[in-house]
Each structure stands twice: as structure tokens, then as C-alpha cells.
Amino acid sequence: MDSEPSSGTSVSTTASSTTTTTITTSSSRMQQPQISVYSGSDRHAVQVIQQALHRPPSSAAQYLQQMYAAQQQHLMLHTAALQQQHLSSSQLQSLAAVQASLSSGRPSTSPTGSVTQQSSMSQTSILSASPAPAQLMNRSQTSSSTSGSITQQTMLLGSTSPTLTASQAQMYLRAQMLIFTPATTVAAVQSDIPVVSSSPSPSCQSAAAQVQNLTLRSQKLGVLSSSQNGSPKSAGQTQSLTICHNKTTVTSSKISQRDPSPESKKGGSPGLESRSTAVTRTSSIHQLIAPASYSPIQPHSLIKHQQIPLHSPPPKVSHHQLLLQQQQQQIQPITLQSPSQDPPPSQHCIPLPNHGLSPAPSNAQPQHCSPVQSHPPPLTVSPNQAQSAQQSVVVSPPPPHSPSQSPTIIIHPQALIQPHPLVSSALQTGPNLQQAAADQVQSTAQLNLPSHLPLPASPVVHIGPVQQSALVSPGQQMVSPTSHQQYSALQSSPIPIATPPQMSASPPAQLPPLPLQSMQSLQVQPEILSQGQVLVQNALVSEEELPAAEALVQLPFQTLPPPQTVAVNLQVQPPAPVDPPVVYQVEDVCEEEMPEESDECARMDRTPPPPTLSPAAVTVGRGEDLTSEHPLLEQVELPAVASVSASVIKSPSDPTHASAPAPPLLIPAASTRSSSTSLASSTPSLENKPPQAIVKPQILTHVIEGFVIQEGLEPFPVSRSSLLIEQPVKKRPLLDNQVVNSVCVQPELQNNTKHADNSSDTEIEDMMAEETLEEMDSELLKCEFCGKMGYPNEFLRSKRFCTMSCAKRYNVSCSKKFALSRWNRKPDNQSLGHRGRRPSGPEGAAREHILRQLPITYPSAEEDVASHEDPVPSAMTTRLRRQSERERERELRDVRIRKMPENSDLLPVAQTEPSIWTVDDVWAFIHSLPGCQDVADEFRAQEIDGQALLLLKEDHLMSAMNMKLGPALKICARINSLKDS
């Protein structure tokens, strides 16, 4: 078993890495075209990338190195197996040479020569289509040197060839390649993880993981899948795909037709495996026809591939086809590994599918590995299938293909993946059945797969219908595939229906191991989970088995979650009517059961055996197939069930039902680690459009002038959140209502008036209300003006007035009150001040006057200042003026007291109003002013009485009396003070 898995792993690694049948044919042969294809810049890029890869700075690099060692071992085994299969792949070699020349090949070590050629082929496909990076990735994964060179190429090329290693290459791919082929990158990442897990041995796992990564990437281009069949075949197929997708598809189908007979005949021989590989590469149809032991699986993958091309536009179709093929190839390599360990969850799928074709386990496995890789590995390996499902998801992302078909294709690869687990049991039990299925695949790919695989059969059938026409007439079908033709083919093939029983028989065996992780995390269709879960578990088991590969896988897995977003990409596919290809005999059952079964998938209640067929088909077709063609959908659904990833892809195709199956697809592909993530992302897909939502999360990584820019999972919000905008608005009415309810005194009219009076104040109040919502209930405030009761949040900052109008009115009323009190007080103040001047001695009187008048004067000054606010204008008097005036009056009185002992006469006059003063009173007043004794006589000479004194100005004094400006100003100031008093 171990030797078989390892050989199978190596084969799968070779297939996935070269996948160009270079390994199958001869690494040297592939290398030559690659070298010829490679340009100086490419070589330099490879060197640079290799240097970067061999750097141990990151754990990813260490994992890559481990993966490289494992891959080299796998390549050695693969090379031996592929050489044995050289005869079968000889047909493709011519094509491979052409493809190598067309595609930019890259020199690499002999073991990685095939890988290199595939990378060159993948490059060609990249040039022709965005998926090329996937091919490069697959090849780079095949061998450490190849992966290093591929990685370098991808680095230099940018998004075209982003492959460093299973983990590193994926990371780089994401960073650099996602820009150009986001879906491809994701698919590659996803496939990487499944491959590792599916590989029975660590080295095999790492190789498988790398192969799967490469396969995913190459699948994106489709070149990889073709090249995987055989170095020549894959090259030819890749070329055809790259050159013209429609033509490529036709060529692939033709090649597969050529090879199918030998392959089916050689069910247990390397030649058969290589042919199966060739078939896979040549075209999905051919895979269905050619594979004898795992031909059902391969045919299924082929069918899927063809479905994609058929439904999708010819160019895009070929691209998708390549992607699907590569995905399936990735899955198949895993299957090859699993065959020996069909019972174990990790490997059970791999050995059986491979052995189904070739009884000899060790011999067949290596061979199968390469064919498996060459043709989509979905059927070949259950773990790989899980990964393949992921890859399928990636493939499905290319929506250019007919919406339903492309999803169907994606699902089919996954279905193939899961079918392989089922097939592993079924194949082991009856390899002849598989061979017969392979033959049937030739006649009817759909039937072939079903007979070969209980569950896979239905997925195969799905593909078969889509690709059946292609299988029958590979060239024509691929060139001019029609979903209806595929549909008829599917329906015509009775095996699909029969397959469910087989599936029920074999899936349960596989399902038990798989369900544990896949089913639980996947909650997808039980059948899909049974196979898909088995794949997932296989991947997990393989990871456990392979420490280095596991580490690598883990890295990819961690990176993979974004690839699982690829499942979302599948949503792009949803338009592709792959579902019609899915046309399944189970159609009737599936259509009716589709909603329920897809729900079952989500519930994980689905029964693995018979339900698998219908539930899988249901889930897959539910969203996509239902829309396009229920029969096909159901068949596709079965594949989807088989591989959760596929179902996810399907769900993108058929938004309506795809959502339910989609989550399962994602989970198996992601494996346990990513399964939870996939579930989260895929659950939304249970509803038709959610898968599209999954696509959006794809993280696009751009490398611009050396800067790696990753796009966020979500766009930055352009407008403010509706929550932010609406909440304050809701709060305000709430606050206002609370205030109105709590404040009974304040009627609504008053509230409205208040707001009208000062809108800014109300805004402030509202803001304060929001800020002090907690305080509102604690205390109530009373307005000092209107007496209204209210919460503090509705009062002004001072918390004294409820509104600004109340504050203003309060100020006006206060100023009026002050003015009235001041006017009422003034006569008393003055009389008091004058009366207090009656001391017996002149000095004592002055002293008394100051002491008495100051306390009274200051308050009056304050009142005057307050009166400035009064609407009525009044003369402004400053404190200094009043003090100076009082001083003058005091001095004048002192003088008069001195001159006139009888001041009793003057005092009454001084106490009277200035307007009634006589000339003598004015003289006495002026004489009392400081420094004005000399001018007092002038006033008398001018006969200025009290009234004239009040009318005097500085000019009068200066002109009429020739007074200096200083004394004139002082006198005028005193006169003004008299006026004010």
C-alpha cells in the first residue's frame, strides 16, 4: 500500500507538476521543448526565483524545501511510471512538443523537466488565458527545482507564473498572480492543500500538494491538465487549448478518443494510465472515454472540463476546461495515492480509482498517478478530490463559460473527486466495472463514470452528458459543445442512475472516514460529504502522514481560505449552464429532491449511498443546474455532493440552489482547517447569490512597482453608516417626547416656540440630552424666568433657563429693575452725600464727605454699568469722572466755607439742582474746583449761572475765557457730572 501510494503520489506529482505527460513520456523530451521555449529572461527569472526559494528566511521556504525533496522522490517514481506509459502518451508527445514551442518553456532539472515543460505549457496557456499561473504552479510543485524555477518565473512574470512552492508559491501567487487571475490563484492554493492531505506518504503528499497546486494553476489555463496527460500529450493539449480554446478542446477530445481505447483496455497497465492521462489532457471527454480503471473518474473530469468549454465561450471555455482538467488531475493524483488505502479516509479514494483502472496497485498507481494528474484528478483521489473540489471552485470562478456549465464543471471535478472515494471502493470491488465504465465513457462519459463509481458515476454522468458528445466526438463536442447535447448524453447514459446504488455501496465505506471531518465541518450533502468529506479527510490524513508535506499544505491551507473564496468565483460561473451537462438520469429524482437534498447537504442528514447521487446532483444543480437544466443539474449536483468544493462551485453556477451545496464544496477543498472557514463563507451561498458574496471576499493582491498591495475583503464604506446617521435622528424625537411627557407644565406650543426662537440652542439642548440621558431621570431643573420644569439636558449651559428666549427676557427684566431701583435710589444718595458734608470743620467735612459718598457712589456706578444694557440710552459716566467731580465740589465747598463763614446759605444752594444756581453759586462751585480759583472770577464776569454752566463746552471756556485746555476739561467734566446727577 505504501509503495503504491508513494508511486501514485509521485505519478500524481509528476502529472500535476508536468502534467504535460512529460513525466509519462520522458522528462528529457519535455525538457528539450521547455529549454527551447525558455528565453534568456525566463532562465534568469527561474534562477532568481530558485535563489529566493532556497533562502531559509521563512518557514514557508523550509516547507518548500521539504516539499521539493518529497517531490523529487515522487518525480523519480513518476518518471518511471510515465516512461512505462510513454507508448500511450506518444500520441500527445507531438502536441506536447508543439505546445512547448508555443508556450514559453523553462529549463529545469531532468526530474523537473516534465514539470518545467508543463510550466512552459502552462505559460503558453497563461499567455492565451489567465489560468497559466495555475499551470506554472502545478509544475513548480511537481519538483522542488521545477517549482523553484516556476516560482521565479511567476515572480518575474508577475501574475502569469506565481509558483514558488505549495505554500510559498501559493502565497506569491496570491500576492502577485491574484491581480491577473485571482480565481486561478485561489484555486491553486486550495488544490495545494488537498494534494498534500491526499498523498499517502509525506513525500507523496508534498508532491501531491505541489501537483495539486500546479494542477489548480494549470487547470486555470487548461494547459496544465492537458500537459498532465503526458508530456507530449499534455503539451499538445495545452497548446491546442492555449492556441484556441475551442480548438484546444476539440484536440483534447480527439486525443482522448485516440487514447481512450488503449487506456480503457489497459485498465491495469501503465500504458492505460498514461493514455488516461492523455485522455484527460486531451480533453475532458477523452478522459471519460480513455480511463479504464479510473476512466470513469477521468472521464468525469474530462466531461467536466469539456462542459466548461462547451458551455462557456470557446476561448474562455477552453480556459475553464483546462482549469477543470487540472483540478481533476490534481484530484486524480490524490486518488492514485489513495487507491491502495481505499479503506483509510485519507487514501481510500486514491488507490481505488487508480486501481479501478489497473489492478496492479504499485505499477498501476504510479501510472495512474500520472494519468490521474493528466486528467482531472477528481475521480482519481478522494483527498485530492477534496482539493480538486477546491480547484474546481477555482475553475468555476471563470464565469466566461456558460453560467450553468462552468459551475457544473467545477462541481463535476469535485464530484469526480468524491466519486473517486466511492470509486475506490467500487473500483476495488470491480475494476472491470470501471474499465467497462471507461469504455462506456468513450461511448457515454456519463455512463462510464457512474458504472465506474457509484457516486462519481453521477458526477461523471454530469460531466459525461456535458462531455459525452465530446467523448463520442471529442473534437466536435469540445469545439461545438452544447449543454443540450451533453444533457442528452447524460440522460442517455443509464449508468448514472445505476451509479447511485454503487455509490451507496461504496460511499458509505468511504463516507465513514470522510464524514468525520468533512461532513461535520461541511454540513454539505451527506453524499457529497461522504465522498467530498472522504477527500477532505484523506487530505487531512495525508497531511498527518506527511510532516513536511503537511507543513507545506498547512501553509497553503492558511493561504487557502482566500482560494476557497474561489468557490465564490464559481458564482461567476453560475451563468455557465454547466448544469445541463449535469443532466442526470437521476434528474427526475434530483429535481424533486434538489431543494430537500441540498438542504440535507447543509444539514448533513443526507445519506451517503444512494442519496449521494440525487442529493449531490440536487445540491450542485440546485442553484445552477436547476436554472439551466434540472437533469444536468442533478447530475452535477451529485458531483457537487461528492465534493463539497464542487457543490460550492455549482452553487455559484446556480445561485438558487448552489448556495446550499457550495458550502460543502468549499469545506472539503479547504480540508478541516479551511473547512470551517469554507463553511462560514459557503453557508451564505446556500442562498442563490451568497456564493457570489463569497467571490467578493477574494483578496486581490497587486504587485505594483515592487509594492504588494492587497485589496481588502470589503470595500471601504463610501458613505456614513446608516446606523450612525439614523440613531441620532431617532434619539432626538425620543428625547423631545420624553421632555414633553415629563414636563407637564410646558405645552407643546411653548416647546415649538422655544425651538423656533433659537434653533442652535435647541440643537445644543439635543446634544446635551444625548450626552446626559442618564442624568435626565435623576434631576429636574426649574427655569428662573418662566418657572418651567424640565430635564437638565433641555436647559441651557447655565442650567438656569430652559431656552435662550427666557434668558434674554430675564436679562431685560433685570436691567429694567436695576434701572428703576437706581433712579429711585439716586436722590437719596445725593441728598445723603450732601447732608453728610455738614461737619463743623472744613477738613472734617471733606473727610466725612469722602467716607460717606464712596460707599454710595460705587454701587451707583455699578448700576450705571448695568444700565448700559438698558434700551434707553443714558450719559456714560465713569468712576474716575465722578470721583474728580466730587473732589472739585469738595474743594469748592472748602473755599466757600473759608470765604463765607455763613455757608449755611450756600449749602442749600449747593444741595439744589445746578440748573437753578445763580451766578454766585456757579462762582462758588468753580472756585471749589481744584486749580480753578483763578477762573472763578471769570465765570462771574461772564455772568454764567447754573443753566449756562450746564451748557458750557471746552471750546467756550478756551475761547471766551482764554483758559488752558487742562482746566477747561476739568471744569467741563465736573459740569457733565452735574448734568448726570
From Swiss-Prot:
Keywords assigned: Developmental protein, DNA-binding, Isopeptide bond, Metal-binding, Nucleus, Phosphoprotein, Ubl conjugation, Zinc, Zinc-finger
Record-annotated SAM domain positions: 917-981
FCS-type ZnF: 774-808
Reported tissue expression: Ubiquitous expression.
Covalent cross-link Glycyl lysine isopeptide (Lys-Gly) (interchain with G-Cter in SUMO2), where: K689, K730, K808
Domain of life, per lineage: Eukaryota
Gene Ontology terms: cellular component: nucleoplasm; nucleus; PcG protein complex; PRC1 complex
SMART domains membership: SAM
Skewed-composition ranges (Polar residues): 224-255, 360-373
Motif (HD1): 689-718
GO molecular function, one term: zinc ion binding
Sites of Phosphothreonine modification: T607, T612
Chief location category: nucleus
Residues annotated as binding Zn(2+): C783, C786, C802, C806
PROSITE patterns in alphabetical order: SAM_DOMAIN, ZF_FCS
Described function: Component of a Polycomb group (PcG) multiprotein PRC1-like complex, a complex class required to maintain the transcriptionally repressive state of many genes, including Hox genes, throughout development. PcG PRC1 complex acts via chromatin remodeling and modification of histones; it mediates monoubiquitination of histone H2A 'Lys-119', rendering chromatin heritably changed in its expressibility.
UniProt-recorded name of the protein: Polyhomeotic-like protein 3
Lineage: Eukaryota, Metazoa, Chordata, Craniata, Vertebrata
Annotated gene: Phc3
